[in-house]
């Protein structure tokens, strides 16, 4: 990684990409901090991961992260490499890791990386060719997230807050805003039916799409 900086390559992907090509289960063997927080979701994961990083750094913690933006397996591998010595053990100065993780990369990362906490910001339609429907992504996360991880979920998003129902969880939400509406005007709405009782959802207010209360 230092050599890449000297040659003016930022190295956000290449070291980890090479490591995974040489050893597909590289993440199994590389050292990791004792405490790991993962952030995933369709929108806002970079912002949330960076905010957590900044807050914890301001509190005096030494944080290992992939905040340069590469959130697939190669980027996560590079971030962990950055925190390890020559023998692959995590250097003792790192108190924890904040890792932004792409939703579709979950099956390749979570078998080897076991976060204490996983923040899921929301799940939306994104790239149809890659992500299909948000329910499809929710199913990937449900099957991939470590059972021991505590989830921090968006209570205003009925898709992401139902992920991995067997995991321990806490919820966050945002109070009603002046711009919220009582009727949804979006042509697309991926959550019309209650995921528990199958009845039609009645919203007190909506923020956009299926986000609301």
Regions found by a protein language model. Name each.
Residues 1-196:
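Phosphate-binding loop of NTP-binding sites
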Residues 63, 201-202:
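Generic preference for hydrophobic/aromatic residues in regular secondary structure cores
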Residues 193-196, 200, 213:
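The −1 position to Zn-ligating cysteines in a subset of zinc-ribbon hairpins
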Residues 202-208:
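Short Cys/His-rich "knuckle" micro-motifs
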């Amino acid at each position: 990684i230092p050599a890449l900086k000297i040659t003016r390559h930022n190295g956000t992907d290449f070291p980890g990409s090479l490591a995974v090509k040489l050893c597909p289960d590289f993440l199994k063997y590389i050292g990791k901090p004792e405490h790991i927080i993962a952030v995933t979701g369709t929108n806002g994961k970079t912002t949330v991961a960076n905010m957590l990083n900044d807050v914890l750094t301001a509190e005096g913690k030494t944080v290992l992260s992939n905040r340069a933006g590469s959130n697939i397996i190669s980027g996560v591998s590079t971030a962990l490499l950055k925190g390890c010595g020559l023998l692959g053990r995590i250097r003792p100065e790192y108190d924890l890791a904040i890792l932004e993780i792409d939703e579709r990369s979950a099956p390749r990362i979570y078998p080897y990386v076991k976060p204490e906490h996983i923040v899921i910001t929301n799940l939306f339609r994104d790239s149809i060719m890659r992500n299909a429907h948000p329910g499809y992504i929710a199913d990937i996360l449900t099957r991939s997230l470590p059972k021991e991880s505590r989830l921090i979920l968006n209570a205003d998003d009925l898709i992401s807050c139902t992920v991995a129902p067997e995991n321990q969880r806490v919820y966050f939400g945002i109070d009603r805003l002046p711009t919220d509406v009582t009727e949804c005007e979006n042509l697309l709405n991926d959550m019309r039916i209650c995921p528990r009782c199958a009845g039609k959802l009645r919203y007190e207010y909506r923020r956009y799409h299926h986000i609301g209360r």
